[in-house]
């Protein structure tokens, strides 16, 4: 079976649609595994929620998902993110809010634990160093953990001696999930932050035990036009073309 590992859609409909089209082009998957932040930053929160719900999927809550329904204080967000969260909250239907409200913060599926931030702090913690990642291995019981939040495609591997190593997930290069425990981030769909503006996602093949990353170009300008139309912060508009 194949599963799409997706994260940080961030209300970017053009990017999400491009990723879903690519998944279908590759033969489809059994299920989407979404690592949170469906909404926030981008201009199409309702349509992205609707599109995700049209597919068989599991999903954990991200910090932007919770902030948009009043479950996290906006004081914890930077000013531009807070502005986008307030705007997002005004767009959501009651059905959208109920869907986001019912998202769990942790899901266990087979050998995987799914969280948005980290297994230690599922909503907020960023895993961007071997130090924080190494400490996180003690907070989940499965062999592997899938995370989002940083928008950077990466694998953290726990060695037999207890040390933690870091490796970037490279485009179209399969990563075999072997004996070592790993924390895997498939990168961000709606707002990549590794210097590559293309949408990022991965497919996991449960028969070959391989995770493969894909980078998908999309119409960035179309998203920027919609963001500008809704008076979302210009810094958020510009960063899409920079991949930062």
Annotate each PLM feature.
Residues 10-15, 40-42, 64-69, 120-122, ...:
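Active-site environment of divalent metal-dependent phosphoester hydrolases
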């Amino acid at each position: 079976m194949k599963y799409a590992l997706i994260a940080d859609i961030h209300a970017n409909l053009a990017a999400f649609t491009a990723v879903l089209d690519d998944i279908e082009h590759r033969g489809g998957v059994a299920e989407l595994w979404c690592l949170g932040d469906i909404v926030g930053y981008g201009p199409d929160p309702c349509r992205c929620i609707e599109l995700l719900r049209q597919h068989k999927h599991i999903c954990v809550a991200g910090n932007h998902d919770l902030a948009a329904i009043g479950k996290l204080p906006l004081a914890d967000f930077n000013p531009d993110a807070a502005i986008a969260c307030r705007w997002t909250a005004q767009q959501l239907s009651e059905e959208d809010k109920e869907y986001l409200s019912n998202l769990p913060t942790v899901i266990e599926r087979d050998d995987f634990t799914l969280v948005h931030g980290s297994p230690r702090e599922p909503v907020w913690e960023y895993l961007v160093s071997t130090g924080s990642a190494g400490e996180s291995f003690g907070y989940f019981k499965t062999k592997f953990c899938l995370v989002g939040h940083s928008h950077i495609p990466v694998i953290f591997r726990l060695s037999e001696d207890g040390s933690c190593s870091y490796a970037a997930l490279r485009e179209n290069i399969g990563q075999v999930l072997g004996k070592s425990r790993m924390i895997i981030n498939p990168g961000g769909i709606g707002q990549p932050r590794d210097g590559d503006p293309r949408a990022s996602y991965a497919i996991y093949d449960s028969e070959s035990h391989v995770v493969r990353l894909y980078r998908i170009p999309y119409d960035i300008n179309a998203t920027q036009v919609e963001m500008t139309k809704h008076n979302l912060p210009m810094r958020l508009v510009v960063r899409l073309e920079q991949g930062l």
